[in-house]
Curated annotation (Swiss-Prot):
The gene is AADAT. It holds the Pfam family Aminotran_1_2. It is an enzyme of class 2 (transferase). This is Kynurenine/alpha-aminoadipate aminotransferase, mitochondrial. Its cofactor is pyridoxal 5'-phosphate. It comes from Bos taurus. The modification N6-acetyllysine is found at K69, K179, K263, K339, K422. Transaminase with broad substrate specificity. Has transaminase activity towards aminoadipate, kynurenine, methionine and glutamate. Shows activity also towards tryptophan, aspartate and hydroxykynurenine. Accepts a variety of oxo-acids as amino-group acceptors, with a preference for 2-oxoglutarate, 2-oxocaproic acid, phenylpyruvate and alpha-oxo-gamma-methiol butyric acid. Can also use glyoxylate as amino-group acceptor (in vitro).
Length: 425
């Protein structure tokens, strides 16, 4: 892979931060070293001394004074070593990427910890998107991605999708406007990457099948573009066996994968991780060095302590319990939809994630119905227009989340919505 052609001029100009490099060196230095170089504050001046955090299905996590001093201090930009090590082992267990044993320059698998996967994705976009670049997305698309990409001035080309995710034939038709060799000619402006949420897509709830992923990956090889696999709902797939990931079939080192603990451990701790070819991960870390500097050391240590206590089996056991909860929540929302919205709307049952994507029949644009009328009836959902690059266009869809409401609340919400729809027709 020629990674240089994907890197923006701004990203290519980034150099390692001297102070951040020093932090890395000092973390590996023997304790006998007398450091007069660090700009880190003296931890003895910090007011927080100890903490004990109780854990469901586990022993309390204790931060003694020494651990607390480390937790409150600066740390390495790529992530603390023990968490990086655990996560790399997890990725090998779950995905077994072909690139594990590649040479570093040839796309060897690497990863870094980020302040949630959203930060990681923003760093990826900053690294590879130039104004005018053509990139491939599938609408409806996560609104956070739209708002991250639009200011960068790229051209977002929509690839059609259905309840099984991106339609390969649609992607093939779009790509037919270029020749495979056009990727070597910057003037041809062939697509630089495909962005996709393969499981429980937010907002549509659809999930890519293994067969479609293989077709898409082969097209990526043919036309030489990257795949950004944004998979925050990977640990919320309701049906087993789980479909193989793009990372698991990445023979070329062209997949950048974003994972998150936000949905299964904590959304507020802001711990995510980006996995991909080493030359690109190293460049993402350079972006981190001059922005957030590193994810919260405290949050990383807390998550790391939990994961080492649980082990992989314990963590995946917790994931299964989370899945059981959300499956029941989904089923409750489906029951409410079947009861009240049949004949008034249409939808597909989500196989992952926490969202139901609903199209109201007979109403060209549901924005006013959802934003104003429904809110007056004390039900709150999101109109679908916010998940399209042209948010001003009429849209008959809305997104309903089944993460927090009780089954009784879901039933009441859809009962009220059904009445509003009937009044609006």
């Amino acid at each position: 892979m020629n990674y240089a052609r994907f890197i923006t001029a701004t990203s290519a100009a980034r150099k390692p931060s001297t102070i951040r490099v020093m932090t890395e060196i000092l973390s590996k230095a023997p304790k006998s070293v007398i450091s007069l170089a660090t700009g880190a504050p003296n931890p003895n001046t910090f007011p927080f001394k100890t903490a004990v955090i109780t854990i469901e299905n586990g022993k309390p996590i204790q931060f003694n004074e020494q651990m607390m001093k480390r937790a409150l201090q600066y740390s390495q930009s790529a992530g603390i070593p023990e968490l990086l090590s655990w996560l790399k082992q997890l990725q090998v267990k779950l995905h077994n990427p072909p690139t594990i044993h590649y040479a570093p320059t040839q796309g060897q698998m690497d990863l870094c910890v980020t302040c949630g996967s959203q930060e990681g994705l923003c760093k990826v976009f900053e690294m590879i998107v130039n104004p005018g670049d053509n990139i491939l997305v599938n609408e409806p698309i996560y609104s956070g991605t739209i708002h991250a990409l639009q200011p960068l001035g790229c051209n977002m080309i929509n690839v059609s999708s259905d309840e099984h995710g991106i339609i390969p034939d649609s992607l093939r038709e779009i790509l037919s406007k270029w020749k495979p060799e056009d990727s070597k000619n910057p003037k041809k402006n062939s697509p630089k990457f495909l962005y996709t949420v393969p499981n429980g897509n937010n907002p549509s709830g659809n999930s890519l099948t293994a067969e479609r992923k293989r077709e898409i990956y082969e097209l990526a090889r043919k036309y030489d573009f990257l795949i950004i696999e944004d998979d925050p709902y990977y640990f919320m797939q309701f049906n087993k066996p789980w479909a193989p990931t793009f990372l698991s079939m990445d023979e070329d080192g062209r997949v950048i994968r974003a994972d998150s603990f936000s949905k299964v451990l904590s959304s507020g701790l802001r711990i995510g991780f980006i996995t991909g070819p080493k030359p690109l991960i190293e460049r993402i870390v350079l972006h981190i060095q001059v922005s957030t500097m590193h994810p919260s050391t405290f949050a990383q240590l807390l998550v790391s302590q939990l994961l080492y206590q649980w082990g992989e089996e314990g963590f995946l056991g917790h994931v299964d319990r989370v899945i059981d909860f959300y499956r029941k929540q989904r089923d409750a929302l489906m029951a409410a939809a079947d009861k009240w919205l049949s004949g008034l709307a249409e939808w597909h049952v989500p196989t992952a994630g926490m969202f139901l994507w609903v199209k109201i029949k007979g109403i060209h644009d549901v924005r006013k119905l959802i934003e104003e009328k429904a809110f007056k009836k004390e039900i709150f959902m999101l109109p679908g227009c916010g998940f399209y690059t042209d948010s001003s266009a009429p849209c008959p869809y809305f997104r309903a989340s089944f993460s927090s409401a009780s089954p009784e609340q879901m039933d009441l919400a859809f009962q009220r919505l059904a009445q509003l729809i009937k009044e609006s027709l």
